[in-house]
């Protein structure tokens, strides 16, 4: 049986794929006058930290160079979209029951997210994450280490749990997160479907299962 679980947050425990995409789409329209293609979002935005996204944005047009204020602008727009759609600010079905059961069983748990601190604080408050995770068990993009697909965030999460990465299950939804988990030597990977035909997009031998929700997740996927 695997000893601990590390969760990505956005898109994994909380379905916000389209809200994230819309927030970035608004900025691409504003500054580049074009739409953000689905494939472009998936490869160059989804699951990446803002430092890497900023580097990508600055590669689009040599005459248009931005600083972190553009990513800050996006996060403000994203949080506003969440506030405008409170019906969307809910966990994926089965998440609360799974977290309750794992906490009661003493299973070590952490969150490893590409979010920066402003969104981490927003998520802690909105979802009352302190019910299951102390702040030191929420590892986020503090710009001191490379973001996904680098393995650092998952290596740090496993270390916080006091576990070898091979003894951990990771729950992810993005290509970059999948590659990060693989590079970290994670023992088992569960991928939540965030788009149609995801199985045909993501091919990785580490993937144990694709899921739509967390109903019946524990203990099934730790065994």
Where does each model-flagged region fall?
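Ser/Thr-glycine-rich phosphate-binding loops at phosphate-binding pockets of nucleotides
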Residues: 12, 16, 113, 177
């Amino acid at each position: 049986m695997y000893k601990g679980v590390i969760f990505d947050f956005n898109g994994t425990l909380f379905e916000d794929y389209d809200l994230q995409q819309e927030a970035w789409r608004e900025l691409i329209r504003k500054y580049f006058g074009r739409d953000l293609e689905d494939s472009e979002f998936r490869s160059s935005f989804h699951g990446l930290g803002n430092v890497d996204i900023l580097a990508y944005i600055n590669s689009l047009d040599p005459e248009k160079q931005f600083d972190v204020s553009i990513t800050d602008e996006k996060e403000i727009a994203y949080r506003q979209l969440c506030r405008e759609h409170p019906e969307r600010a809910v966990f994926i079905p089965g998440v609360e029951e799974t977290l309750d059961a794992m906490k009661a069983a003493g299973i070590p748990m952490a969150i490893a997210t590409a979010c920066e601190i402003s969104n981490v604080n927003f998520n802690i408050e909105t979802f009352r994450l302190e019910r299951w995770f102390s702040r030191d068990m929420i590892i986020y993009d503090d710009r001191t280490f490379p973001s996904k697909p680098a393995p650092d965030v998952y290596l740090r999460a496993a270390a916080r749990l006091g576990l070898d990465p091979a003894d951990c299950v990771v729950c992810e939804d993005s290509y970059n997160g999948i590659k990060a988990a693989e590079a970290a030597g994670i023992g088992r990977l569960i991928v939540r479907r965030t788009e149609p035909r995801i199985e045909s997009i993501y091919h990785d031998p580490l993937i144990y299962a694709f899921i739509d929700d967390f109903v019946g997740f524990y203990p099934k996927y730790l065994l």
